[in-house]
Amino acid sequence: MLEELKSKEKVIGIKQSLKAVENGTVKTVYIAKDADEKVVNPLKELSKKNALEIIYIENMKQLGKACGIDVGAAAVCIIKDIW
């Protein structure tokens, strides 16, 4: 599951994730369980509205590390394959 975060095209962070979901380019949404609810709720709601799969990861540090960054991430979205 987390291997996908290293190998696939993705966007990292709440703002970029919201934009990607609004644009209809997202396949899967990953959200850290320890992220502030006020921050991630808009993404959760929009993802549910668009019938996207949401996968919850234990914490922001683990989600960031899985993406190959040295800081935590509240949310990450995997972009749909274009072809």
Spans of model-derived segments:
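Signal for well-folded cores of large energy- and translation-related assemblies
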Residues: 6, 22-25, 44, 48, ...
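Feature captures the catalytic cores and cofactor-binding loops of soluble hydro-lyases/lyases
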Residues: 35-61
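Glycine- and other small-residue-rich loops at beta-strand/loop junctions that grip anionic moieties
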Residues: 6, 32, 52
